[in-house]
């Protein structure tokens, strides 16, 4: 789904560099071919699906669920009018879909899951990205972005799934609970994370490919845990504002 490949003329594969005008190189060598989801890169127009409402007033809502899958039912007609949402209780895939819907078609920009219990202790794959509803056109000429700016994740979370926040282009703030163990491919790819310190907690064992790629607003000192067993390629690709990347108890890794 998120396959990114680059091949030089001699068949070698290496570090990918994408410059203005889609000039692409592998380890500084050209020519190469670059594909995303099997398609050539295209310029994309970013639009909102939220219906304009001049009379909208900021709305904060706290919800307590007794079972997974009832968030949309509890919110009812308020689903697309809530700006800031606190969810206590049980949260499953269906509830994440409701929150995605509220941030795509509505006003939801802040989500607090601090006291929520997540199914499988995970943020599901593509929780806040649904290609068929966010892209339009045969070549993906139009992209409809979600308005999510901040999310607070709960202790007990172990996994952030593949593409969980992929192209959540308004997302600026997220926390990483001490219980986290796994960050999937493209998890925060192309977000606008703005942190001075990005500390991945001790206990995390895998951070997969392109998890923080294209985070161009991320002007941070990144600290990786000593527990890392897998650090995949392209992790911080095209994140030019990073100050440094260090691993606890080890040496400076560089950008």
Predicted regions and their residues:
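N-terminal segments that cap or nucleate solenoid repeat domains
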Residues: 16, 24, 36, 55-99
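Short, T/G/N/S-enriched strand-turn elements that build extracellular solenoid repeat scaffolds
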Residues: 70-78, 94-103, 122-127, 163, ...
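Consensus positions within tandem repeat domains that build extended binding/scaffold surfaces
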Residues: 127, 161-164, 184-187, 208-211, ...
């Amino acid at each position: 789904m998120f396959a990114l490949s680059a091949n030089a003329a001699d068949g070698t594969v290496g570090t990918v560099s994408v410059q203005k005008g889609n000039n692409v190189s592998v380890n500084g060598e050209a020519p190469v071919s670059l594909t995303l989801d099997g398609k050539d890169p295209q310029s994309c127009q970013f639009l909102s699906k939220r219906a304009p409402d001049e009379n909208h007033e900021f709305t904060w809502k706290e919800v307590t669920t007794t079972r997974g899958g009832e968030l949309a039912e509890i919110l009812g007609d308020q689903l697309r009018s809530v700006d800031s949402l606190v969810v206590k209780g049980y949260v499953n895939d269906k509830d994440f879909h409701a929150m995605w819907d509220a941030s795509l078609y509505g006003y939801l920009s802040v989500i607090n899951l601090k006291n929520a219990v997540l199914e499988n202790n995970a943020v599901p794959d593509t929780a806040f990205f649904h290609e068929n509803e966010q892209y339009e056109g045969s070549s993906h000429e139009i992209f409809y972005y979600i308005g999510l700016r901040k999310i607070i994740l709960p202790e007990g979370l172990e996994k952030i799934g593949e593409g969980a926040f992929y192209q959540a282009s308004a997302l600026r703030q997220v926390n990483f609970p001490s219980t986290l163990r796994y960050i999937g491919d493209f998890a925060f790819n192309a977000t606008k994370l703005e942190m001075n310190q990005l500390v991945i907690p001790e206990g995390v064992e895998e951070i997969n490919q392109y998890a923080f790629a294209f985070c161009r607003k991320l002007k941070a000192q990144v600290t990786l845990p000593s527990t890392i067993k897998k650090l995949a390629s392209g992790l911080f690709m095209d994140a030019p504002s990073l100050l440094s990347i260090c691993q606890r108890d080890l040496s400076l890794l560089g950008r």
